[in-house]
Each structure stands twice: as C-alpha cells, then as structure tokens.
C-alpha cells in the first residue's frame, strides 16, 4: 500500500514506448546537443583547474625593512673603468661606488664579452686597486699635498689612497701625474678600455624609503654636503650613455610579475645627456595556492631625457643613468584562488540540464512545425 502511494511522488513519469516517435531531425538535434554538452563540460574542467587572481589593497604598516634592487644593465659605449654606482636616500644614507654584490663584465664594441673568465666582482676590483704593488712601496708614500693627520690621512701608497685623500680635500685627481696610479696602470686601463661597453649586474640593499641610485662616470665623493663625481681622468668628456636595461626589479619575482623596464633600450644620438627614470614602487605580497607568501614589490615608471651638451661641448651636468624611486603607502596583496568542487559540479549539472531542455524545446518546435506544415499540404491536395 505504501509503495503504491510512493508512485505519486515520481517527478519523471514514463511514457509507453509505443507512443514515442523518433525522427531524423530529433537525432541530428540530439547529436548537436551532445557535442555542445561535451564542449561546455571540457570548458568547465579547464576552468576548474585554472586559478583566479584576486587583488586587495591596504595600508603598508611594515617598518625597518630593506629594499632589494636587482639590476642587469648593459652600457654599449661606456667602459667598466669609467662607471661608478652610487645610492642615496632621504634618510641621509649614502653608498659611494657600490661594490658589494655588484659585477662588471667588459664588452667589445659589438657587445660580445671580451674575456671568457668569470666576471670580476666590483669589490675585488677596488680591493685589488688598494693593495696592488703594496709590497713594492717602501716607507710612506706622498699624498701630494692632501695629507691630513686629523683625518688619518698621512701616507698614500696606492692610487686609491691618493684618490680618497684628494676627495677629502674636494680636489679632482689627474691620475696621469700620480706615480702610484701610473705604477698600477690606472691611466693605461682607461686607454685600453676606451670604446668598450660594460654589463653591470647584481643587487644592492637600500633603506625602504625614497631615494635614488645612479650610474655615472668617475669616482664619487661628498663635498660640502654635495654629491660630486671626479671627471678629471676623463679629459675628452665624451660619454655615451646608451644602454639596455635587461632587468630591473625591486624584490623577488613571483608568477605573472611584469617589470616595465625589462628589455628597454635607449640610444643617445645627438650628444651627452642624462637619462632619468622616476619609479613608483608598490609593496606587494603574493600568496600562492599552497599558502606560500612572497613579500616583494611591483613598480610603475615614467622617464625623462635631459640633453647636457651637444657633441664636442662641455657637459653642463653629470651624464649618466639615474633611477629616482619612491614607495607607495598602499600595499597590494595578490592571491591565487582555486575553484571549489561543489561549484564545478553545480555548473556541470546546469550545463547538462540547460542544454538538454533548450535543445528539447528546439526539437519539439521543429517536429510540430513540420507536422502542421505537412497537414496543410495534405489538406491542399484534398481540395
């Protein structure tokens, strides 16, 4: 009795097979509907295994962290012996002639590496310049008027020590007239590398505040609270700052990151100038599907070129490549999110039911339209 009453709840009543009519158009519509269902199903499978990227913005509350700046820049017409990398920020911290974690590779005028040996670490170059032929020097070498016992400058046995003593006095150094520099081959290196290019790569660590770093010819020092580059050794004054930024990033990379300055090439044609890039750094946290978090940065950039002198003229400023960066107070969180299986199952059921219903209506429309048309044709033949 209970089982017979249960039949009343059947939402899918069945018809007798004898009352079912199968047609060619119905078969075609069914095949098309099946193909459509399969296409939508595989689309949902692809979508299920893909990830969505969500962005959130909030105030950056981090303090006291360091900012890592990764760089790989090729100077097509500036020798490695000419280049100096300096960094400074609004907190007053200065890094002169940065050498730690910076490498330089000499390039031929055609852009090919000149030597096959491993690239020379910049701090090793400076160390080598400081101690080269030190054993050959007896006693206390002259600083040529730049001695200052109050600052601990009494003897200058190397070219680097003479340069430091001169920079303390605010004097320019002509290495061609300094025996220490002649002995170490400083001027000879400048002459030998003339016409070459240089690839500079590595990274620097700076305070997480606004600042700038730049590549410019000559050794740098501070005089009367001003940042100065000694261009005395480069008497011709012809500095071509044409360059290619192979890579420039602030922090670690994450999937999908786009650095707007990567593979950017600038060519100097009319004279000596200053390339300036104004960078807005946005602190970013990337969170993957596995929960791993990467604290890094993204950035946007605007650029400006300032012509300092036409060819053959004296530059009215310091030629070079300058990056002025500022940090946004807003932090961005980039999160990967996957699809839930329940959502996938719901979409698949909706696809199958929806396509089956729509194509069923379409098949019924074709069947009854054809049947009515056939009746009218038969009725016309009768009369």
From Swiss-Prot:
It is a multi-pass membrane protein. InterPro entries: Erv (IPR045888), Erv_C (IPR012936), Erv_N (IPR039542). The keyword Endoplasmic reticulum applies. Residues 1-26, 369-383 are cytoplasmic. Pfam families: COPIIcoated_ERV (PF07970), ERGIC_N (PF13850). GO terms for cellular component: COPII-coated ER to Golgi transport vesicle; endoplasmic reticulum; endoplasmic reticulum membrane; endoplasmic reticulum-Golgi intermediate compartment membrane; Golgi apparatus. The chain crosses the membrane at residues 27-47, 348-368. It is found in: Endoplasmic reticulum-Golgi intermediate compartment membrane; Golgi apparatus, cis-Golgi network membrane; Endoplasmic reticulum membrane. GO terms for biological process: intracellular transport; vesicle-mediated transport. The keyword Endoplasmic reticulum applies. Keywords: Endoplasmic reticulum, ER-Golgi transport, Golgi apparatus, Membrane, Transmembrane, Transmembrane helix, Transport. Residues 48-347 are lumenal. Possible role in transport between endoplasmic reticulum and Golgi. Belongs to the ERGIC family. This is Probable endoplasmic reticulum-Golgi intermediate compartment protein 3. The gene is ergic3.
